[in-house]
Amino acid sequence: MLIYQDAKNIHTVTLDDCRNSIEEFVAVARYHAKVKFTEGFRKRVSASRKSLEATIASGAGVYGVNTGFGDNVRYRISEDEMVQLQENILRSHGCSVGRILTEEEARALMLMQLMSIGKGYSAVRLEMLEQIRVFLNEGLYPYAPCEGTIGGLSFQPYIAVTYIGEGRLIENGVPCPAAEVLKLHGIKPLSIKAREGLALLSNASHSIGVGLLAVYDFIMTMRHADLCAALVCEALRSTDKAYDPRLIQLKNHKDTSETAEFLCKVLNGSEIMNESRTLRVQDSMNTRIIPHVHGAAKRMVTQTYDALMEELNAVFDNPVFLADGTALMGSNWDATTIELYCDSLAIAVMDVAKLTEVHVERLVDPHLSGLPAFLVKNPGLNNGYMILQYVTAGLLADIALLASPAACFNAAVSAGQESPIYRDDTAARQLYAAVQKLRRMVSMTMMTA
């Protein structure tokens, strides 16, 4: 089932090994559930910080600790400049413009920071994670423009600087200086230390967080879409002939079979359907293919769920620090998996939306449905659902654009040092937007059916 409880009914989420469920994630990001740390979480983070001290003492070159960032990795940073280096990256990298992150997007990003860094390989102080936890529990909402970014690199700093009392927080719907808002809430600004600025940016926090919100919503939407499809079958006087288990099992698709079984169960005993069995030899394709379209989308969301849950439980920092003080530098932050699965699921969303729009179009067309034109008394004088069908067509067009793969783009950045680029953030945001539009389309179909 993937989702076993309603996220809004979860009021407290405890972070221990940070292997939490998608429902718990949504509970914090969307419904403001409180976050708690276990003692094991605290000890693990504190131990990780000690490994950094050993690394610095060794004098070894470590990316982003005693070197510059990106192509500036060639420049060594002295120990007395290490704190300034971290402050600089937070202040210099916040360059995105345009649309502001929604509150649940910002909260999802902050929660991902806790869950990733909290695994104990990022060598930050516990105080930094406590600050993020306080932000979540107090409902503080950073002001973060998010357009014009590669990954989240140019808008995550807008959030991170609020931890140190800079930038802006949205208070009562108005962007206000972070220092003033923190004072109002009795929160002391964090003093950033060596390594900590990069740890807040070297990740895929936003794309994983928004991707999980989209997956959660799509799973819930498909439950409603199945029920809605049963109503459509009745309204169009279709039958369940195409859902015969003897036929469906030959397709050998588990999700298709389960969808067909659900439709048969819901439609069992329907007087309308029983009366319709002799109307035609074969129903229109738009009702026959419901289990196949919905089943394929469910398979894709299951695969995306699995991929994003792996990312949720991953360490994607760079560098990472082992208990013996060894610093390992690589690309665990790489977001190819997020990018590809979010792109693919957006295409599945579009496929469901295509079928949904066809159902509305047939329901309001008297020549196809046999029902009053636009489902209203006195058509001509009254317009009924005429324009509602226009809206579903417009939403479908929007979803088609959002389903264009974000992965099909590249550019050179940081003097070629950090190329190719990945558009995981764009892919996740497009998926999220597509799912919200599909939710509205399903609601409109329910109205017409």
Give the predicted meaning of each segment.
Residues A179, L184-G186, S202, G384, ...:
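Extended C-terminal regions of large enzymes
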Residues M1-S58:
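N- or domain-start disorder-to-order transition segments that initiate the globular core
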Residues C233-K354:
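Accessory "access/gating" subregions that flank catalytic or transport cores
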